[in-house]
């Protein structure tokens, strides 16, 4: 069972997964013009990005699927699945259309040497954008969450 903690409460502080900042890593050359491994990190954020934004804007939806309301746990579950990687219209943003009940979109922003999670939300149909790759979370996620079927 993964352990989630925070480095602090400021908007640029991080959620940690088992003591590390990376929730997943997109390997080098998976995306156009990205030649280095790119970790995916969840920052505390504010009203516009990160766990604070996700709780404020999508909290009711989140609690239906993550009853304790822990954004870090839910994001980790989503990043342990697979989906399409899309380039979105906004500069420096990447969309991951990930599938795990519920279907969702996870939006990343390129910060330079890592991707910061901007938001995650319910998205029944596909995102608008150019498909540039496939995200394979069960291979790339840090300590992948494995859904147990009953």
Residue ranges of model-derived segments:
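Ribonuclease/tRNase effector modules and their secretory precursors
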Residues: 1-150
